[in-house]
Amino acid sequence: MNKKMMTGILAGILLLGGCTQNAAQPTASASAETEKNLNAEYTQLPEENAFYYLEKDGVETLILHGTGILYLGFPECPWCQAYVPQLNTVLLANEAKAAYYNIHTDKSEDRTFYDQIAKDIEDVNDTGNTIMQYDNDGKAVIYMPLVLFVKNGRVIAYNNETCMEDSSVIKPEAYWTEEKKSALQTALNKLVAEIKTAQKENEAKGCDNGCKVD
């Protein structure tokens, strides 16, 4: 056997070995996230922030089966821009992460998916309040900013403060007084801490339901 052939065989064995070793399998949400940084779209966010992008196929998985925090918004929304840094402050304080998805794009580009997500949210809604709004045709409308707190496939809480505000009436910077910022962060802190604890508990059990713990 010549030297070149022997080298090729050894390389093949090493490559095969690398594929069959005990590699950790990513969770549903972790495999769906990308490496983009949200501060490219949300200009008030620092580069080191607590958000990760969730692809379309991971959104329903997180809502129906996961444990985590899902932020729905879109960068053209001034209220979403103003909300994100406040949520980020709370997430960082709790060493937690939040998934981000721009559902607004799907309203025009993939209405079937948009409607399905709206239905999913209400189907697992344990908050006691209706999260969705409805237009004159009876179609669900997801008003944003909206942050969902999901625990084992149930929406246990949400926050959508300012989702109905009109920036032509009041600007976000005028609305968000220091008192309102403090009240929001107090409310969010309790919920973020609860989800973080649930994620750790699931991880300790060998969580395989789409939860994410960093």
Where on the chain are the PLM-derived regions?
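Typically the conserved alpha-helix immediately C-terminal to a functionally engaged Cys/Sec
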Residues: 81-94
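Bacterial signal peptide processing site
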Residues: 20-22
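C-terminal motif of bacterial Sec signal peptides marking the signal peptidase cleavage site
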Residues: 15-18
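Non-catalytic, surface beta->alpha helical segment in thiol-disulfide oxidoreductase systems
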Residues: 138-206, 210-211
